[in-house]
């Protein structure tokens, strides 16, 4: 029985391209293959514009390979995908990518390098609203309302047997009630109000409209203060979640504050493990939320959280003690303590004072410092207190100019023995061999991460507005950063293996038979 044999070659007479598979045109070491190994669609390049991505899908063969030769999506399709599908799921996608990479690369999650940077928001530059200015102007409105109520009672309501009550501060609802009482007491009809040239307003209409204007301004100030909240003192009108901060790169040249977000990252073995976005200009208040997010993501706290002096506070140190973390965050005067010998050994510093048998501090002149009282420290979570000590007598002291030249009375010092002991523990940790290696790695990994993002990828300004969209954008950036880092590590390992094999072949002895 004869079998039908297929003798057709893999081509058509109208074929217009060779080869048939686009992937044969792409270098085997191209990052696009790593993309497909981890997930189906991802972008590791520095393209953030959706229109630019659409253009690449039409012209770049690497993007065509990802699309499997399907029709290139429009920029609106990309935008809808990000806005509707990724906004709520991007955190889980980021964790899934990290879980894959960390298991393949055996990432150490016990050593975490923490740092923050300020990224300029996508907001107009001169759209600031200052909370303190709103509070000050609101108080001025309160004073004007009191004067207006006096005029109302004296000029109009006094003849009608009515009187409006004055207060130190006026709520919006109370001003609305005053307007209604004044309108009802005087029989005003807003439909009969006059305006424009040739019309003279009555005194009742003038007072009523003036109070209406104050009410409108109070509502505006109340809204501004509510948007600022308790955690910040400013916001931008075009991006209400952005806070005005002082950036290192002052391209405007006038030392002006710019709307920005504080990006916090936790780096493990050069990968971004956790990111967080906060409206605080200082890093000190960002440590606990970032570490808590790390715990929620990986189920444990890092054993060695390493950070710069911006994170070293009493609250953060005690937080580390509570959760079994070692103290490897520098404190404010760490650099001066370790590099300035004159400052470190200054005999007039309270920490260098000697103590007598009773535990009293003794100054270089031999005078005792007696305990006066204990006072609490403001804005402290753990109830931190300070001990206040005063010298017995500074009169006729030969060390007056070196010890306290500006003091007119006996010198007083404030100390916290617990905080002093914590600083000494931090010094011992960071000056050890292990601590020196951690400090070096923090500078390389955390600072290097921001260097790659800001300078190598030219990512210095956000593209989206609103905290939720900013977190989405930065998480997408972190996904691309980790995948690109993983790809580069794989390529280096493959190259090292290839060189090792080549070297082995070159050095094998020749065996003669």
Language-model region placement:
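Cysteine-cluster motifs in flexible loop/terminal segments that predominantly coordinate metals
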Residues: 360-414
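DNA-recognition alpha helix
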Residues: 52-65
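Conserved small/polar residues in nucleotide/adenosyl-binding loops
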Residues: 503-510
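Basic, low-complexity segments
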Residues: 2-44
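Polybasic low-complexity intrinsically disordered regions
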Residues: 58, 73, 78-322, 332, ...
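Short amphipathic alpha-helical "interface-anchor" segments enriched in bulky aromatics
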Residues: 32-39, 57, 354-368, 373, ...
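Phosphate/diphosphate-binding loops
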Residues: 318-319, 327-367
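Generic long, charged, amphipathic alpha-helical segments
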Residues: 418-430
